[in-house]
Design a protein with these regions (language model features):
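Short, charged, low-complexity amphipathic alpha-helix
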Residues: 1-13
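N-terminal "domain-start" segment that seeds a small globular fold
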Residues: 19-55
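Short active-site neighborhood of thiol/selenol oxidoreductases, capturing the structured segment around
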Residues: 52-73
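Conserved helix-turn-beta segment immediately C-terminal to the redox Cys motif
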Residues: 70, 76-97
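Thiol-based oxidoreductase modules, predominantly thioredoxin-like and allied folds used
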Residues: 89-105, 116-127
Length: 195
């Protein structure tokens, strides 16, 4: 590729190992099998009620991103990146983002970021905690975790398929692997809302 064929072969071998490990990871994530979930209700950007079934649109599969809300620059980084991929994702399955912010806060923030995907407020539902993306701390505060859940629709029933977390260095934001290849890859960096 760039004149170091032995190095490139070693890199390709590692990619092959990573691909095999990723297959194992996906199999583990799906190993619980399908579990039926209720048809939760959310609010869209105008305050209208939208159900989980509605989010599938014309598809039988759905990806829901669990976003921690407008206060998290990391969640914003992932959402900004996913926004440009929305047409590709929606060609394959339903796609939406759910936030713990109220619908007006979420709507204002998403408009400011120019997000292209549908986004909903989950503030009046137990969906986020039921999916495992929030928990109560010892001091009584609610702590949110970012990630996504996949769903399958069979007739009018909804089944949870799998989930995964977002975090620095994950596979879901391409900037982390690219930054790893910088000379000073260990240099601490944090996303911001603006630069």
């Amino acid at each position: 590729m760039y004149g170091h064929t032995e190095i490139q072969k070693k890199i390709q071998d590692k990619y092959d190992e990573i691909a095999a490990l990723r297959k194992e990871q996906v199999a583990i994530a799906k190993s619980e099998g399908l579990s039926e979930v209720e048809n939760y209700s959310f609010k869209d950007k105008n305050g209208n009620v939208v159900t989980l079934l509605d989010m599938f649109q014309s598809h039988d599969e759905l990806i829901v991103v669990h976003n921690m809300g407008k206060s998290c620059p990391y969640c914003t980084l992932w959402a900004d990146g996913l926004s440009s991929s929305t047409p590709h994702i929606q060609n394959r399955c339903g796609f939406a983002l759910v936030s713990p912010n109220d619908y007006q806060t979420m709507s204002d923030f998403a408009a400011n970021r120019d997000w292209k995907f549908p986004y909903y407020s989950g503030v009046e539902t137990s969906f986020i905690s039921d999916m495992g993306f929030s928990h109560q701390t010892e001091d009584g505060k609610v702590r949110y975790t970012p990630g996504f859940t996949t769903f399958l629709k069979k007739e009018d029933k909804i089944y949870r398929v799998a989930c995964d977390l977002f975090g620095p260095g994950d596979l879901f934001s391409p900037i982390w692997p690219m930054m790893d290849m910088l000379h000073h890859s260990d240099k601490e960096w944090h996303p911001k809302f603006g630069y």
